[in-house]
């Protein structure tokens, strides 16, 4: 067989599966994987794992999960790394059904309780999917097992409450955590500032900004979007331009949604020239504005700042 080149072909196909999977080239990895099976070789756990992780890296967790089920049908055991990689992908996508499927598989394969990271990812997945009750139940179950939620996990649950505008539930959660001696950090404060800004609660948002500074942190970049929108909404020229200055300096970090939100807020606040300047930046990045923003840009300027975008002075 070696003389006919079968062994070398098998070795080559195996090496290609690992190589293409690590690089995220799932099309080539799949081709090498199918070639391997065509030689009559039964892929082992390592080859399956390489393929599954390759699909995850390529943003195709559903295909990876399909291979994991194929493994289980062949009585091959998936590693914890595989489960967690799939779960991270589903959490990032906000795919609650995908996360639930992985949860069932993990509980079936494991005799012990799930890890803190697993529960934290369930909170994230259900929260992003708008299934707040399930996010909270996983959060509570995690705490019953003795796990201490970190700032990211708390922020994901608060963000879920923000999605359904349940400020009372969020405040009860934070008060209970404070009572239990669990401190929140910059990530959670950032979610809260954005929430307060959206509600127009400027004083409350600024109090939270003070708490961020007391932690020795500058407001995160993404928070400048919220601040710019909040201050332009009340036509506070000084603070609008402060936040806008940070955004302009780091505009390469802005995505289409951030541009859309900021430009619309500037237009509504009467900062006409600033809005048009940001719109040009958006066009230069070849981002497609929303239909609403396109309509806003052809509408007549608002009364405030119709000439320069900044006419009157406001107290800071």
UniProtKB/Swiss-Prot annotation:
Repeat among keywords: yes
NCBIfam families: PPR (TIGR00756)
PPR repeat residue numbers: 9-43, 44-78, 79-113, 115-149, 150-184, 185-219
Organism, scientific name: Arabidopsis thaliana (Mouse-ear cress)
Stated name of the protein: Pentatricopeptide repeat-containing protein At1g19525
The organism's place on the tree of life at top rank: Eukaryota
One Pfam family hit: PPR_long
Similarity annotation: Belongs to the PPR family. P subfamily.
Keyword annotations: Repeat
């Amino acid at each position: 067989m070696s003389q006919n080149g079968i062994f070398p072909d098998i070795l080559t196909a195996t090496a290609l599966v690992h190589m293409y999977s690590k690089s995220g080239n799932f099309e080539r990895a799949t081709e090498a994987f199918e070639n391997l099976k065509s030689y009559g070789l039964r892929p082992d756990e390592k080859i399956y794992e390489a393929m599954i992780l390759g699909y995850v890296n390529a943003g195709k967790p559903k295909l990876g999960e399909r291979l994991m089920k194929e493994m289980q049908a062949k009585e091959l055991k998936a590693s914890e790394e595989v489960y967690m990689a799939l779960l991270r992908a589903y959490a990032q996508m906000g795919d609650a059904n995908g996360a639930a499927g992985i949860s069932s598989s993990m509980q079936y394969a494991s005799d012990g309780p799930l890890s803190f990271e697993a529960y934290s990812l369930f909170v994230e997945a259900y929260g992003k999917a708008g299934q707040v009750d399930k996010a909270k139940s996983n959060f509570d179950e995690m705490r019953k097992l003795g796990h201490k939620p970190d700032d990211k996990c708390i922020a994901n649950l608060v963000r879920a409450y923000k999605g359904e505008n349940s400020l009372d539930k969020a405040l009860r959660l934070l008060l209970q955590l404070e009572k239990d001696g669990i401190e929140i950090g910059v990530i959670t404060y950032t979610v809260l500032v954005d929430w307060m800004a959206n509600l127009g609660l400027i004083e409350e948002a600024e109090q939270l900004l003070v708490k961020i500074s007391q932690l020795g942190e500058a407001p995160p970049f993404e928070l400048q979007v919220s601040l710019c929108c909040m201050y332009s909404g009340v036509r506070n020229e000084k603070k609008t331009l402060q936040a806008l200055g940070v955004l302009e300096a780091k505009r390469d970090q802005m995505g289409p949604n951030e541009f859309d939100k900021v430009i619309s807020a500037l237009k509504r606040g009467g900062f006409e020239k600033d809005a048009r300047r940001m719109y040009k930046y958006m066009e230069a990045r070849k981002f497609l504005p929303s239909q609403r923003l396109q309509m806003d840009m052809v509408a007549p300027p608002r009364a405030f700042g119709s000439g320069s975008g900044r006419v009157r002075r406001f107290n800071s």
